[in-house]
Amino acid sequence: MSKLWGGRFTKTAEQWVDEFGASIGFDQQLVEEDITGSIAHVTMLAKQHILSEEEAAQIKNGLKTLQKKAAAGELVFSAAQEDIHLNLEKLLIDEIGPVGGKLHTGRSRNDQVATDMHLYLRTQTEEIMEAIRTLQAALVKQAEGHVETLIPGYTHLQRAQPVSFAHHLLAYFWMLERDYGRLQDSLKRVNISPLGAGALAGTTFPIDRAYTAELLHFEGIYENSLDAVSDRDFIVEFLAASATLMMHLSRLCEELILWSAQEFQFIEIDDAFATGSSIMPQKKNPDMAELIRGKTGRVYGSLFSLLTTLKGLPLAYNKDMQEDKEGMFDTVKTVKGSLRIFAGMIETITVNTDAMAKAVTSDFSNATELADYLATKGMPFREAHEVVGKLVLTAIEKGVYLLDLPIEVYKEASSLFADDIYEVLQPKTVVGRRNSAGGTGFEQVKLALGKANDLLSQSIKG
């Protein structure tokens, strides 16, 4: 089969060479964007009298026919035509005749593919942002029922201080809010049109780049034709934001996995998001959480792969840049799938409040409260820290917890202790008193829930 660019060649490549160089196996995912960009381009060509209205109408009708066939899954692509652009151009010529060959006037595949990816990423980024909001809503809904449910807070995976379970869940809400913001900000770079930049130097045809940008709902155009076709930083930025998002999901997955283990029993993951064992009948494995944790590495890999591909490329377009798409497609699929699974998983977890309550009363996570108690009575905090450390050691030696020590032991340690110390040491008192801004105190958690709900409401209205 002859190539659309084959005029200067005297021989054709072997089929296996064509297959190695072809990208149609994956860039056919850009079929809708490619047709949309082409319709805008040919509309502009007619407006600028580069093509006649009749020619433009023929081409647009042909493109819309291909669009319908694509939606119905009726288009057949060929590796011999390399990519989605040449495949569609060949199919268009087959559909409407030689006039289809005028579509590419004033355009290169270099600005064409860049336009496709800008259109694709704009849509996908907006859909991922919506999915983040859905997960955030699930976290808020779960948190609203557990403002006064207490869970051990950890540092170094050692119990540190008790916190509200709602406060813990909302930590991820705010991480996701920053992820949302990063993606939202990236749209400023995505929503710029490279169409009309040509191969690298622009074109001699009197095209109107601003008009095609307007037709495609871009906010502006690339100001430099070399830049427009040479860089993929907008994809790098998307991949970096996605990698950060997946890192946050992976961390919460790790906690869900730990919390669902027999050693914790803080939560139970719904059967719909777990699997069993082929040999051990008792097993219930948190597979979906583990898969999201594992798939995080795929997204990291896509980011590092593209950065490595781009780092040594001279301007302008190089065939290496064909490698920019598969990682992008895979990341979009991975992130969207992970967010969808996660929202369902969070909505349906069963919280074992009894296990959590038992955990916060069978440790020394209220020790900081003792030190704060002494500090509020005038003892320097560093001295208070040492006094409480010795009380913890005494309790460990006696095989009890701080609430179990008799008042005499406290008064022997410091005359500042009084009978009210036992109320101070109660887990709900410990948590409830931490009402500094952003703290785990119940009033602060309720305020945080209000702010979170306001953000979600604004997104719905927007």
UniProtKB/Swiss-Prot annotation:
Example of a GO biological process term: arginine biosynthetic process via ornithine
Catalytic activity line of the entry: 2-(N(omega)-L-arginino)succinate = fumarate + L-arginine
Keywords: Amino-acid biosynthesis, Arginine biosynthesis, Cytoplasm, Lyase
Signal peptide extent: none
Name this polypeptide is given: Argininosuccinate lyase 2
Location relative to the cell: Cytoplasm
UniProt xrefs under CDD domains: Argininosuccinate_lyase
Source domain of life: Bacteria
EC number: 4.3.2.1
Cited Pfam families: ASL_C2, Lyase_1
Gene of this entry: argH2
Top-level class of the enzyme under EC nomenclature: lyase
SUPFAM superfamilies reported in the protein's UniProt record: L-aspartase-like
GO annotations of cellular component type: cytosol
Pathway where it operates: Amino-acid biosynthesis; L-arginine biosynthesis; L-arginine from L-ornithine and carbamoyl phosphate: step 3/3
Organism expressing this protein natively: Shouchella clausii (strain KSM-K16)
Family (UniProt): Belongs to the lyase 1 family. Argininosuccinate lyase subfamily.
MF annotations from Gene Ontology: argininosuccinate lyase activity
Main location group: cytoplasm
